[in-house]
UniProtKB/Swiss-Prot annotation:
Descriptive protein name: Methylthioribulose-1-phosphate dehydratase
One of the protein's GO biological processes: L-methionine salvage from methylthioadenosine
Annotated residues for binding of Zn(2+): H98, H100
Gene3D superfamilies listed in its UniProt record: Class II aldolase/adducin N-terminal domain (3.40.225.10)
Pathway listed: Amino-acid biosynthesis; L-methionine biosynthesis via salvage pathway; L-methionine from S-methyl-5-thio-alpha-D-ribose 1-phosphate: step 2/6
Any Gene Ontology CC annotation: cytoplasm
EC assignment: 4.2.1.109
Length: 208
């Protein structure tokens, strides 16, 4: 069982995040999926196929940390395991967001296979939890898109178990995943990534 009040709070944070992200064009149509931790065993997550700018309480369901629905006949996103693996790895994480912005999608296709996006020298790197200086380096791995979500979940688990300080990743031609202790932290990370992605794309354009 899970606490209904905590579920309602988590669901409301997801609804509000959906409006925020849709208004900025980072989660068009029914793309993207969002989640928030309820407790050590349960997560609130968006129901599959729902328009993220028009979410209501009925568009958020509960799953356990294995991605199984709890007290619901609804179907969560096919990518639910990409959320739950982060909650399993990091007990302190309170929210995970997956967006489909143009910049994240395009940039993910420009990074050569087998390479990661490296961000350094940007003052805005300090927007991420735990980052104190622009002199460090953020490494954003780019995983190939696949319909085999369990395999992709394990790939992300292996990488982030070895790099717990990194705050997100890209899926090629697909979008961004990031997380934070709170939904507010997570939304701040999305904004920071979007700014940094735009800087990288503009740098590539100027250098051509």
């Amino acid at each position: 069982m899970f606490d209904v009040t905590r579920y309602a709070t988590a669901a409301q944070s997801i609804v509000e995040a959906g409006r925020f992200l849709y208004e900025r064009g980072w989660s068009p149509a029914t793309s993207s999926n969002y989640s928030a931790r309820i407790d050590g065993d349960h997560v609130a997550i968006t129901v599959s196929g729902r328009h993220k700018g028009q979410l209501g309480a009925g568009d958020v369901m509960v799953v356990d940390l294995h991605g199984q629905a709890v007290q619901s006949d609804c179907r969560s996103s096919a990518e639910t395991l990409l959320h739950t693996v982060i909650y399993q790895l990091y007990p302190e994480v309170g929210a995970v967001l997956h967006t489909h912005s143009v910049k994240a999608t395009v940039l993910s296709r420009l990074i050569p296979a087998g390479q990661a996006l490296e961000l350094e020298g940007y003052e805005l790197q300090k927007a991420f939890n735990g980052v104190q200086t622009h002199e460090g380096k953020l490494i954003v791995p780019v995983f190939d898109n696949t319909q085999d979500i369990p395999a992709l979940a394990e790939e992300t688990r292996d990488w982030f178990a070895r790099h717990p300080e990194q705050p997100g990743y890209l899926i090629r031609g697909h979008g961004l995943y990031t997380w934070g202790r709170t939904m507010a932290d997570c939304l701040r990370h999305i904004e920071a990534f979007e700014f940094l992605f735009e800087c990288e794309l503009e740098t590539m354009r100027v250098r051509r």
